[in-house]
Design a protein with these regions (language model features):
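A glycine-rich phosphate-binding loop feature that marks nucleotide/adenosyl-phosphate handling sites
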Residues: 168-169, 317-320, 374, 417-427, ...
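Active-site phosphate/pyrophosphate-binding segments
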Residues: 333-334, 338-454
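Long, contiguous, secondary-structure-rich segments that constitute the structural scaffold
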Residues: 566-616, 708-710, 714-725, 729-814
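Short beta-alpha connecting loops at secondary-structure transitions
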Residues: 282-288, 548-559
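Extended redox/cofactor-interaction regions of prokaryotic respiratory oxidoreductases
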Residues: 2-7, 182-270, 277, 295, ...
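N-terminal export/assembly segments and adjacent metallocofactor-ligating motifs
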Residues: 2-309, 335, 354, 460, ...
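Long, well-ordered, tryptophan-enriched scaffold segments
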Residues: 273-377
Length: 814
């Protein structure tokens, strides 16, 4: 049964003023505003920091998790124990200057991670079945010997292609401790000294947008910095929620709001869920069915084209395939974008607002109004987060959303954007070299479970294998460093569980982590890692608008229990594997840091000395070019500064995609197209499976965690409870009240969790914050609220990425 959305719900104008006036959502907006004020009060408290005691040390450390920022933490230590945590106290509130980098509630709770009862204390080996969490304590020497001996046997028997480094972002901001990308880690350096490993491409965050927009712009699609919004007249955010996904100290949300105060730009948010980025600050929220963004864009494009609101001069000069004039000779007649939109292409369907309304759930008159506003307001900052791309049709949807910036000529100008996510300034700080991987073969990061189950069957044309036509061997060993993708963050947990439980398939799993995570329970050998507070490192790679920074992450306390640093672990293994000198080059961890810092000072002359930096804790530098404008050089002179696409221009029509579509072997329902068309993909709103599972389930980044990191911190779990968000209309049909325990289920699994009944969800859609720790009962019903019990391992068509937001479910009261 399809959920009918009342016209009153979707047709109503949702503005800042109207939102606050509305009883139900107004209360939510005011509640959200109260939360914002709370964080403001906490931030102002930094100015009056508590005086330190005479026996108290204040040591700079960092939170290095995968939130988009890296935040400085000033640890107050007495007698070798962290007593409390403060954040950056340098700089001011001026976003035009070297502003403070204020840690969010997660970083400020770092002490609770360091002293968490879940901390891994000793090396252990598995004594029960994988996933049971049954281990016995062993010595470090035994752990090293087991790993070295088994790995050497597996390499001898199956080759280095059988060794896999799993995806992990638990400490991706580190330098020595860096966990992502796996190819830039110390584990990769160790394996490269030993003949290499099976690599992977893509990532769980942005696989589809990276691959999709590569065929539009060439390479990773750049975006204007959020500070440039001070030059914008309009801000349109498709599934872009920096208020939660970028809520930390780098300050994307801060830049967004400060810049809008200068420009007074209207902000329109298009999202199935009313996010904290709105929270009464937006001018309009347009709820949309998940996975239908491309249909909306097509409807908008129809209005823009028929009402002459497109920038024809820009399209003629900078683009390929908008109309017949720039269509490649290899393309079929009427194979251009304009023909597709007007119904003159192969499908013969005009993409009118009425057509788009039936798919998206957005009233046609609202689509017309939005098209006219976008088409007549310039410059406009049009961007997309990474939510819309995490769908079965994600690659093609990202190309479609970028079309709004392209059609209106907003690319390469101040106040505009490319349609991609916001960009930022970065420093050329030198990272730990990991040497060259002798193995050229790679798979999608999402298909490692398939590579265990059916590795030799996986091919380039069917499964996206790169570097050779097919895999020769299955994965026989996994290194899982600082990551929870072994089970918790990987889709379709029950299938993964079945594959991993058979230790004759993947014969050795080594997990290196600080806590007993859901993934750690599947280890054969479990190695206790040091936290960032227990070792020295540099922290960087923050998305921070026009200011970049590096943090001196000093050792705050001695390693707890028998924990060791990743450098010490890999150095000891290198010794047993006969590659110690090649691996360490005779340096300790601190000596490597001093060496890398000396190289970095050559690239960044303003850096202070090592000892001065250690004392000051953070180095900040603003972009000397001012606001970052993506593709500015291309816009100014496309001949001298071509893009890296085959044509050197923006490719609306991609011949490369046409060639892939003609040669790849795709399952029924998967579509790769040279144009940014709308295709529903599998498990969409229009899928016949909707009759059995009538609700779309989507995920979102929850503010109490960074993916699954901090998911075991009690105060954060209490402050931001894990709940399933559901619209009152859907809840009423099912007899569900706020706080009721519900079961969410489909053919892949079942989750029991409390319901949050709220008008902040679009009818027909439910949502779970991703990253909650998997907690199954004896029947494998999850009680932790882990969305990946319900997600699918069927990959997206082009990137072979994770379609985590493409799910059909049913919900019932328990």
């Amino acid at each position: 049964m399809k959920t009918k959305i009342p016209d009153a719900v979707l047709a109503a104008e949702v503005s800042r003023r109207g939102l606050v006036k509305t009883t139900a959502i107004g209360g939510l907006a005011m509640a959200s505003s109260a939360l914002t004020l709370l964080f403001s009060r906490i931030a102002h408290a930094v100015d009056s920091a508590i005086p330190t005691k005479s026996d108290e040390k204040v040591i700079w450390s960092a939170c290095t998790v995968n939130c988009g920022s890296r935040c400085p933490l000033r640890m107050h230590v007495v007698d070798g124990e962290i007593k409390y945590v403060e954040t950056d106290n340098t700089g001011d509130d001026n976003y035009d200057g070297l502003h403070q980098v204020r840690a969010c509630l997660r970083g400020r709770s770092m002490r609770r991670r360091v002293y968490n009862p879940d901390r891994l204390k000793y090396p252990m080996k598995r004594v029960g079945a994988r996933g049971e969490g049954k281990f016995e304590r062993i010595s470090w020497e035994e752990a090293y010997d087991i790993i070295a001996t088994k790995m050497q046997r597996l390499i001898k028997e199956y080759g280095n292609e059988s060794i896999y480094l799993n995806y992990g972002t638990g400490t991706l901001g580190g330098t020595m401790t860096r966990s992502w990308p796996p190819g830039n880690t110390l584990v990769a350096r160790l394996m490269n000294c030993c003949g290499g490993y099976l690599n992977h491409y893509g990532d769980y965050s942005s696989a589809q947008i990276a691959e999709g927009l590569n065929y539009t712009y060439g390479g990773w699609a750049d975006g204007n910095s959020p500070s440039d919004i001070e030059n914008s007249k309009l801000v349109v955010l498709f599934g872009n929620n920096p208020g939660e996904t970028r809520m930390s100290g780098g300050g994307v949300t801060y830049y967004l709001e400060q810049a809008r105060q200068k420009s007074n730009a209207r902000m329109i948010i298009i999202d199935p869920r009313y996010t904290d980025t709105g929270a009464g600050r937006e001018d309009e929220w347009i709820p949309i069915r998940p996975g239908t963004d491309a249909a909306l864009v097509n409807g908008l494009a129809y209005v823009m084209i028929t009402e002459n609101l497109v920038d024809q001069e820009f399209l003629d000069k900078y683009c390929v395939g908008y109309d017949e004039k720039t269509l490649p000779a290899s393309a079929p007649k009427n194979g251009h974008y304009k023909a597709y939109i007007l119904g003159e292409g192969p499908d013969g369907v005009a993409k009118t607002p009425e057509w788009a309304s039936q798919i998206t759930g957005i009233p046609a008159d609202k689509i017309i109004k939005l098209a006219r506003e976008i088409g007549s307001t310039k410059p406009a900052f049009i961007s997309q987060g990474w939510g819309p791309q995490r769908h079965a049709n994600g690659e093609i949807a990202t190309r479609a959303i970028s079309m709004l910036a392209i059609l209106t000529g907003n690319v390469g100008i101040n106040g505009g954007n490319s349609g991609a996510r916001e960009g930022s300034y970065s420093l050329p700080f030198v990272r730990m070299p990991t040497l060259e991987n002798p193995i050229q073969t790679s798979i999608s990061m999402f298909m490692w479970t398939d590579a265990i189950e059916r590795g030799p069957e996986m091919t380039a044309l069917r499964d996206g294998v790169r570097g050779k036509d097919k895999l020769d061997v299955p994965i026989k060993m996994i290194w899982n460093y600082a990551g929870n993708c072994l089970i918790n963050q990987h889709s379709e947990i029950n299938r993964t569980h079945e594959i991993l439980q058979d230790d004759k398939k993947c014969e050795l799993i080594v997990v290196i982590d600080c806590h007993m995570t859901s993934s750690a329970k599947y280890a054969d050998i479990l190695l206790p890692d040091c936290t960032a507070s227990e070792q020295m490192d540099f922290a960087l790679d923050a998305s921070c608008g026009n200011m970049s920074y590096v943090i001196f992450n000093d050792q705050v306390i001695k390693p707890r229990f028998e924990c060791k640093t990743i450098y010490e672990m890999t150095s000891e293994l290198a010794k047993r594997l006969g590659v110690e000198q090649q691996f360490t080059e005779g340096r300790t961890q601190e000596e490597w840091m001093r060496h890398l810092y000396a190289q970095s000072r050559e690239a960044i002359p303003e850096l202070p000395t090592f000892e001065e930096f250690r004392k000051q804790g953070i180095f900040k530098k603003r972009d000397p070019q001012g606001h970052h404008v993506a593709y500015k050089a291309f816009r100014e002179d496309p001949q001298a500064n071509p893009l890296t696409t085959p044509s050197g221009k923006i490719e609306i029509y991609s011949q490369a995609l046409a060639d892939i579509a003609a040669t790849w072997e795709l399952p029924e329902g998967d579509v790769i197209d040279p144009l940014p068309i709308y295709t529903p993909g599998f498990e969409s709103y229009q899928d016949p499976l909707n009759k059995q599972y009538p609700l779309q389930l989507t995920g979102f980044h929850y503010k109490s965690r960074v993916h699954s990191t901090y998911g075991n911190v009690d105060v954060l779990k209490a402050a931001c409870r894990q709940e399933m968000w559901i619209n009152p209309l859907d809840a009423q049909k099912r007899g569900i009240s706020n706080g009721d325990k519900v079961r969410i289920f489909n053919d892949r699994g079942e989750v029991h969790i409390e319901a949050k009944v709220t008008p902040r969800m679009m009818p027909g859609v439910v949502a779970l914050g991703e990253g909650a720790w998997y907690d199954p009962d004896t029947k494998r019903v999850d009680k932790g609220g882990c969305i990946n019990v319900l997600t699918t391992q069927r990959p997206s068509p082009l990137a072979k990425g994770n379609p985590s937001h493409t799910n059909l479910v049913q919900v019932e009261k328990v």
